[in-house]
Amino acid sequence: MSATAPFKTLSAKAAFQLDQELMSTGEFSIDQLMELAGLAVAKTIYKEYPPNETTTTTKNKFNPNKVLVLVGPGNNGGDGLVAARHLKLWNYDPIIYYPKRPASNQLYSRLIKQLQDLNVPELTTLTEVKHLLDSRDSKIKIIIDSIFGFSFKPPIREPFKDLINYLGQNHDHLPPIVSVDIPSGWDVDEGPGTEIDIQASCLISLTAPKPCAKLFVNSGPDKIHYLGGRFINPRIAKEYGIEDIVNKYQGDELIVKL
């Protein structure tokens, strides 16, 4: 779906300031925000790419709802880990690739332990990722791009440069890519630069859309754009001029299609 009604956006600077305000005067903890953001990502996946029934035979149980979650080193990656946990509980079969982890961070260690307790497998090399995606019988239904968020500054560095290059160069035969907040590799305010574009099919803007979201919805036909992260109070919404965004939610919705 291409762009329809206009929507307000938050620049990278404003998004950073809003995040800081949420965790100071707003009294939110980082794990609260990450849990709500990751839940919004999972709900978007469920709505746009609902799970198929798992088939059971006498010999094995086949889950056709495989999801590859590409996890970055920061909060965006944490959102992906949370989403993977929810999806596992909703009859998906997530697999994570997490090549660069924060050192000695209890929050991320807990998220990983939660996935391990659910028997969520982890790939450890890019070669494994390529083999999985290039295999005709891989059955990957969706790729979640939770590598870089709104704080990303180019250029893209390893261990993610080769991964993003691979996604961009092979997007024609890959399953749909769902990007969390920003298509990884894009500048939050300016959009895609001269580097490879991963050609995401769906974008989930968190808190409020960033300027690159407008470029995303106009970058091709059938682009899907959702808003998630319903935790902004009216005072903050007014302060940042995003009342119209907050008011798009209806009833108990945690996500809304823009």
Swiss-Prot record:
Its cofactor is K(+). Its EC number is 5.1.99.6. Keywords: Cytoplasm, Isomerase, Metal-binding, Mitochondrion, NAD, NADP, Nucleotide-binding, Potassium. It is found in: Cytoplasm; Mitochondrion. (6S)-NADPHX binds at N75, N76, G77, G78, D79, G149, F150, S151, F152, K153, P154, P155, D181. InterPro entries: YjeF_N_dom (IPR004443), YjeF_N_dom_sf (IPR036652), YJEFN_prot_NAXE-like (IPR032976). It catalyses: (6R)-NADHX = (6S)-NADHX; (6R)-NADPHX = (6S)-NADPHX. Its main location: cytoplasm. K(+) binds at N76, D145, S184. Residues 15-244 form the YjeF N-terminal domain. It comes from the Eukaryota. NCBIfam families: yjeF_nterm (TIGR00197). Belongs to the NnrE/AIBP family. This is NAD(P)H-hydrate epimerase.
